[in-house]
Amino acid sequence: MAAQNEQRPERIKTTPYLEGDVLSSDSGPLLSVFALQEIMQKVRQVQADYMTATREVDFTVPDVQKILDDIKTLAAEQVYKIVKVPNISFRHIVMQSRDRVLRVDTYYEEMSQVGDVITEDEPEKFYSTIIKKVRFIRGKGSFILHDIPTRDHRGMEVAEPEVLGVEFKNVLPVLTAEHRAMIQNALDGSIIENGNVATRDVDVFIGACSEPIYRIYNRLQGYIEAVQLQELRNSIGWLERLGQRKRITYSQEVLTDFRRQDTIWVLALQLPVNPQVVWDVPRSSIANLIMNIATCLPTGEYIAPNPRISSITLTQRITTTGPFAILTGSTPTAQQLNDVRKIYLALMFPGQIILDLKIDPGERMDPAVRMVAGVVGHLLFTAGGRFTNLTQNMARQLDIALNDYLLYMYNTRVQVNYGPTGEPLDFQIGRNQYDCNVFRADFATGTGYNGWATIDVEYRDLAPYVHAQRYIRYCGIDSRELINPTTYGIGMTYHCYNEMLRMLVAAGKDSEAAYFRSMLPFHMVRFARINQIINEDLHSVFSLPDDMFNALLPDLIAGAHQNADPVVLDVSWISLWFAFNRSFEPTHRNEMLEIAPLIESVYASELSVMKVDMRHLSLMQRRFPDVLIQARPSHFWKAVLNDSPEAVKAVMNLSHSHNFINIRDMMRWVMLPSLQPSLKLVLEEEAWAAANDFEDLMLTDQVYMHRDMLPEPRLDDVERFRQEGFYYTNMLEAPPEIDRVVQYTYEIARLQANMGQFRAALRRIMDDDDWVRFGGVLRTVRVKFFDARPPDDILQGLPFSYDTNEKGGLSYATIKYATETTIFYLIYNVEFSNTPDSLVLINPAYTMTKVFINKRIVERVRVRQILAVLNRRFVAYKGKMRIMDITQSLKMGAKLAAPTV
């Protein structure tokens, strides 16, 4: 017997189908992959029709698995970095003086190189530059100090010089011994103090840091010091509730020792996800549906019922002429099995995916197929009450097919009394005169289909996701029941099935009634499985909100189009018979199921960051109208999208909806208040708060035109000249006197250009030693240092561009104010061999551009002031402490197999 058992081939659970002329028996493509292909094909078809007369759009199907992998990678990324020493905030430029140096704030120097040059006619570039500068602030300030280098000095722990944030080593070789000793004494006083933050021992010291960067650092440190213990408890408690709903155990492996005294932990994301953030995205219903399928839908096989059911009910006679008997032995083709997959997708996503019948004029439809489909369609689908699986057209076609089947009297004649309306099923049949009108579709009550006299949507205990509290109960089956396929369904029934059996008996279809009576347990197992999949696996932040779900059916009946229109998939008549004869049996749960909450949180967090960015950018046009003359809301939308992670953009654009988003959609989304709290959002908001002062972004509107001679000092005393540390800059200490400033608006400039007097007017102002300010446009500012005469394009550069040309006998002038402005510092270096007039030229050089920024970017300081900028409090975690990012713990552990699988 053992040998016989070994030789017995493995039982094939899936049903065979014809792929061309080859009989195949594999399970075909995964239902989730197939769903993506079919939904996208339908969406692309509609979009392609819409875009026929307009621009071309790329309609390639996205790789959802790659998108999910990229989002998981995003979850692993840290928005902060752990460093031993902070960035250098101040550096010094050595001059020939022994007691004076130039101190440079490196933040402003580096910020001046970030982004592109702003122009008036490229608002998208302006928005993109602002985003880059804000992200630069966030990136520079998002650091945690850990294991800083220290030394021992007379029993005290003292910070090493590189920890202080000031670079001065290049200054030491030119200092006197007295000055070096003074600096050394100051360094020896940089004592590390022991502190206690959130019951953890830390090092506290005073260092130097630029104001915008320190704001981000301080906000990050406050986020860590707030511990977020309650947020972690809420997240873990919610995960345990979700695990109970989805039959998944929560893994505590990451959290076994995070409460130890030597551990500092950071929670960058939070659960549960605010579903409003995900569903507020414009035109996102199809993308969210695809994400729900990709992250939650299980894999499974299509199981056929016991073949003895049909053999002892439908085909027990030698000759069989009934429609059911004719179709009993048929085998589906690959296309027909694909239609079966569509049917089960529609059953798993009620209301979101609905079915319609294929219109194929070239196909000659067998009446038997239509009749059988009309009967089983009324037992497979729900049409009304609370939701629908069908379009109104398909429901009517099924009613007509059922009407034809009941009137097809192939065994014996049965009495029929027709009604007055001529509608399908408007007759009474049989000796007891069964009224068939009750099987005509009524979307208001669900009469005639599975929702008839059944509570198929229920609200009971609170669900983990607050936006989707509904429980689907096809056929009145409670999804909490455990399913044993060998015994489940025996003795169970529901109203529509009972009425169908009564009507078939009244119509003289006894064999078919016996068949359906025998199929009832198989039928109940089918819908019990579907109920479990919907209420357990598919429960997600991407599930359709209850208010949208409740509005789907009324909107469909009324022909109203809302934010979540259903996806319509086409199926063939015969596929209804094959779907009735097959049940979707889940074999493996989705691989993404346990990590789905983390993916959802990352996605919602990135959406919140994008929304905050767009809110601030939307205010720019009102703050700086001169630089955004041609700006439209679509410009800052595109700028934020371009600087967002590719994975998030791909999810938002899964159905290529970005090609169809309008300004109304966009502005409505930006102004909605919902946000998903996270560390990244906190730092982004703080970065925008720091960026509210545009001078901190190295952008300014205080740019003046003034003719000033480049200094040419006489070198009567070279030693004294070197000690003074002489330098020149076009950076103003204060704005010029207001009564000497001429404000040149675009209108004034255009008027004078039209009169041909623009240059002459400016020359007259320059000769009077006055100042010209060209509008209030923001300009990009760069900082450069020179130890020799700067190039002429910097010295002679004007704060505007003015071009003239002639065409067709007419003169044209182009004036632009938004040009790149350079703040330069010229450091004079002389030698003892220089003569008194070494720096004097016969023809003097002039500078034409002056800039005022109310920030201390560069200043000349004495040596004893080198460490005067040490005024920021830093917290560093000791080297023996562990800094642990527990964000990855926000995922569930092992998936539990269903007790009956």
UniProtKB/Swiss-Prot annotation:
Keyword Transmembrane: no
Keyword field: Virion
InterPro entries to which the protein is assigned, alphabetical: Inner_layer_core_VP3_Orbivir, Inner_layer_core_VP3_Reovir
GO cellular component: virion component
Subcellular localization(s) per the UniProt record: Virion
GO molecular function term, any single one: structural molecule activity
Keyword Protease: no
Family, similarity comment: Belongs to the orbivirus VP3 family.
Record's function text: The VP3 protein is one of the five proteins (with VP1, VP4, VP6 and VP7) which form the inner capsid of the virus.
Protein name per UniProt: Core protein VP3
Lineage of producing organism: Viruses, Riboviria, Orthornavirae, Duplornaviricota, Resentoviricetes
